[in-house]
């Protein structure tokens, strides 16, 4: 069994139960899914770049991402409706806990000058979104084989009703926060 899933079941649930005094066990917040989105602006000029981004995201997440397309044309960006401009993947269940574990234990300590996340990144409903500027913080990415540095947006969707519950849940997984 995965360590973070076990951590949630054995420790985090009881800590949240004590902190917020829930009456029903179904009220206890949990992580529902993790969405990783990689926007590839260079794909407008060169369509082969999207394949490399898909490959990087496949290595990071462990499953094949969905290629996203532009919804409407924007002339100033030379963007046409239907052009491939990024990729995203939704992780649930065991892959979600596996990714979260690799993110907290391996990837975040490798980010330069990283002090933690701000509480302002919560959306008001307990969901947490942040960005990473480079994909090379993940050990699955071979630094010698990448063509360019790409960032990504990571959204952790929880069943928490408030930001305080969401922060408490994610702090249980040792996600570093400041202020």
From Swiss-Prot:
Stored InterPro entries: Ribosomal_uL5, Ribosomal_uL5_bac-type, Ribosomal_uL5_C, Ribosomal_uL5_dom_sf, Ribosomal_uL5_N
Matches recorded under Pfam families: Ribosomal_L5, Ribosomal_L5_C
GO biological process, one term: translation
Keyword RNA-binding assigned: yes
Domain of life: Bacteria
UniProt KW rRNA-binding keyword: yes
Similarity section: Belongs to the universal ribosomal protein uL5 family.
Summary of the function given for this chain in its UniProt record: This is one of the proteins that bind and probably mediate the attachment of the 5S RNA into the large ribosomal subunit, where it forms part of the central protuberance. In the 70S ribosome it contacts protein S13 of the 30S subunit (bridge B1b), connecting the 2 subunits; this bridge is implicated in subunit movement. Contacts the P site tRNA; the 5S rRNA and some of its associated proteins might help stabilize positioning of ribosome-bound tRNAs.
HAMAP family: Ribosomal_uL5_B
Protein name: Large ribosomal subunit protein uL5
Organism: Rickettsia bellii (strain OSU 85-389)
């Amino acid at each position: 069994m995965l360590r973070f899933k076990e951590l949630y079941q054995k420790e985090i649930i009881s800590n949240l139960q004590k902190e917020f005094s829930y009456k029903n066990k179904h009220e206890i917040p949990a992580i529902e899914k993790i969405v990783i989105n990689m926007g590839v602006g260079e794909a407008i000029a060169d369509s082969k770049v999207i394949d490399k981004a898909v490959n990087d995201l496949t290595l990071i997440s462990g499953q094949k991402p969905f290629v996203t397309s532009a919804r409407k044309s924007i002339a100033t960006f030379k963007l046409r409706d239907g052009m491939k401009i990024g990729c995203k993947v939704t992780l649930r269940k065991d892959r979600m806990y596996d990714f979260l574990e690799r993110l907290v234990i391996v990837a975040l300590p490798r980010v330069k000058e990283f002090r933690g996340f701000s509480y302002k990144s919560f959306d008001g409903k307990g969901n947490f979104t942040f960005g990473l500027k480079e994909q090379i913080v993940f050990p699955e990415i071979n630094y010698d084989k990448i063509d360019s540095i790409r960032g990504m947006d990571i959204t952790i969707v929880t069943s928490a009703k408030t930001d305080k519950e969401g922060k408490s849940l994610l702090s249980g997984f040792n996600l570093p926060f400041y202020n």
